[in-house]
From Swiss-Prot:
Naturally occurring in which organism (per UniProt): Saccharolobus islandicus (strain L.S.2.15 / Lassen #1)
Organism superkingdom: Archaea
The gene coding this protein: trpD
Gene Ontology MF term list: anthranilate phosphoribosyltransferase activity; magnesium ion binding
Quaternary structure, from the entry: Homodimer.
Protein name: Anthranilate phosphoribosyltransferase
Family, as annotated: Belongs to the anthranilate phosphoribosyltransferase family.
Length: 345
């Protein structure tokens, strides 16, 4: 593969084939391409607009080069991040609820543009985010929950970290996280930062051997199920891709004021989650339940979103004990108790 020829092709706004993209991604991730060319390629891809084949090729490369673990029938709630609204980390809270009934391999990283990525909030709750593969299998067996820290499970990505930081713009790597779970999770609720990317990412997911993925983008521009209005969805399964629109009132509840969901830090997010689990923050609790409802539908545990919401109401009642179990087996209960104390007021 001639990198300069690839660059010329991208500058001419020609899309790469899947195999070309996969080979290119492997070379970049392994550190075989000079940084100045990596920068040029990432910018050219962004300016052209990443194609489905390019995303699939890059995702396959990242999956192949990742540290892998086997977690049958797992679900992930990782999204793209980057919506910039700074809401409470609902995907992590939903993952904890889901682990009451199904294996959860939560893939995630530190915050992209929000105040609290999944790694940040789990650390604030006392969780040890560096979990080696053998330990990960043990935790899944004992608790149905493990966090797979992207920086640990994709070690070769350090070869592009400097370029990405220097560029300071979104690149193709920002949208690959949800498609590259090291446990090869077959089920997923995937928040998407832009409505315009739903179609592209759903078509990419269809090529990547998932059983069922629900991609969501909600009003007012949030990479979650909308707390205030419509959620635009793509449901990806072996049968194809279905487009769905769903309103928060279809759950039988009123809209949730977005300002009640904003956080200032990872600790603030952790406190809001614990308060919701304790029944002390109804707004955040509702936000967690509506997102969990859609994840339950992705798992085929319920027949529709309304039934998923009713199931989520039951799960959140058992969430505090589950959180204690998760932290006690892989974390610092003292930190969790500190959050609990701050949440009790």
């Amino acid at each position: 593969m001639n990198i300069n020829d690839i660059l010329k092709k991208l500058i001419n706004k020609s899309d790469l084939e899947i195999d070309e993209a996969e080979e290119l991604a492997k070379a970049i991730i392994r550190g075989e391409v000079p940084e100045i060319l990596v920068s040029a390629i990432l910018v050219a891809l962004r300016m052209k607009g990443e194609s489905k084949n390019e995303i699939v090729g890059f995702a396959r490369a990242m999956r192949e080069l990742a540290i892998k673990i086997d977690v049958p029938n797992a679900i992930d709630t990782a999204g793209t991040g980057g919506d910039g609204l700074g809401t409470v980390n609902v995907s992590t809270a939903s993952a904890i609820l889901l682990s009451l009934i199904n294996p959860v391999a939560k893939h995630g990283n530190r915050a992209v543009s929000g105040k609290s990525g999944s790694a940040d909030v789990l650390e604030a709750l006392g969780y040890n985010i560096i979990v080696p593969p053998e330990r990960a299998k043990e935790l899944i067996h004992k608790t149905n929950f493990v966090f797979l820290f992207a920086q640990y499970y994709h070690p070769a990505m350090k070869n592009v970290a400097n370029v990405r930081k220097t560029l300071g713009i979104r690149t193709i790597f920002n949208i690959l996280g949800p498609l590259t779970n090291p446990a090869n999770a077959k089920y997923q609720l995937m928040g998407v930062f832009s409505k315009d990317h739903l179609d592209l990412l759903s078509k990419s997911a269809y090529e990547l051997d998932f059983n069922k993925v629900i991609l969501v983008h909600g009003e007012p521009g949030i990479d979650e199920v909308s707390p205030i209005g419509k959620t635009f969805m793509k449901i990806v399964s072996k049968r194809g891709i279905e487009e769905v629109k769903f309103d928060v009132t279809d759950f039988g509840i009123s809209s949730i004021p977005i300002d009640k969901l904003i956080v200032n830090s990872a600790e603030d997010s952790a406190i809001k989650i614990v308060r919701a689990f304790l029944g002390k923050d109804e707004h955040v609790a509702e936000f967690i339940k509506i997102n969990t409802a859609v994840a339950l539908f992705a798992l085929d545990k319920v027949s529709d979103f309304k039934e998923g919401y009713e199931y989520a109401k039951y799960l959140i009642e058992n969430s505090v004990n589950k959180l204690n179990e998760i932290i006690s087996l892989n974390g610092d209960l003292t930190k969790l108790k500190t959050i609990m104390v701050k949440s009790s007021g």
